[in-house]
Regions:
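Beta-propeller domains with acidic blade repeats across secreted/periplasmic ectodomains
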Residues: 1-166
Length: 166
């Protein structure tokens, strides 16, 4: 059932023109346990992506990737990708451009996020194109987005994080 004349170079396509790790611009303070965990990972000297060895500044919990299809906001937003980063308390916006049979995306706002909250409880996890043309943000408003297993035991015991149910 496959078209024998269609040559597929890869079944995987990264939309981000900038590559796999692009900085994000969070305004909320990093959680103390993230700072300690990043320091420990750096001290190990193991190769890792920037999101693992830095407490902030890179996507670590991107979610809810949604294309805005409404008409309530200016035309420049229509067809844009909106991406939540629940760990970074941000909503990131990207533009899409056709690239052959697929697309490429680019950061829409240089050096700033579409929404950057200083509230560490703001966890944008999904988006909904509403019937009135607006884009609704689903916020999992809570302190910790990670599961208890992601926080080192000794940090929980020191009181650097309050994980419900941990």
């Amino acid at each position: 059932f496959r078209n024998p004349y269609l040559r597929t170079t890869s079944v995987y396509q990264s939309l981000a023109a900038e590559g796999g790790t692009e900085p994000v611009f969070r305004t909320s303070p990093p959680e103390p346990w993230r700072l300690v965990r990043a320091y420990r990972r750096q001290a190990l000297g193991k190769p890792a992506n920037p999101g693992e060895i830095n407490a902030t500044g890179y996507f670590t919990a991107s979610c809810g990737i949604t294309i805005y299809r409404g008409d309530a906001y200016p035309e420049k937003y229509r067809g844009n990708l909106f991406v939540g980063d629940a760990a970074g308390n941000i909503v990131h916006r990207r533009t899409l451009q056709a690239s052959g049979v697929t697309f490429r995306s680019h950061r829409a706002d240089p050096d700033i996020e579409f929404v950057a909250s200083s509230d560490n409880f703001f966890r944008p996890v999904n988006f909904i194109n509403a019937p009135d043309g607006t884009l609704h943000v689903v916020d999992m408003y809570r302190e910790v987005v990670e599961g208890p297993s992601w926080v080192p035991e000794d940090l929980k015991k020191q009181g650097l994080v309050d994980v419900l149910g941990a």
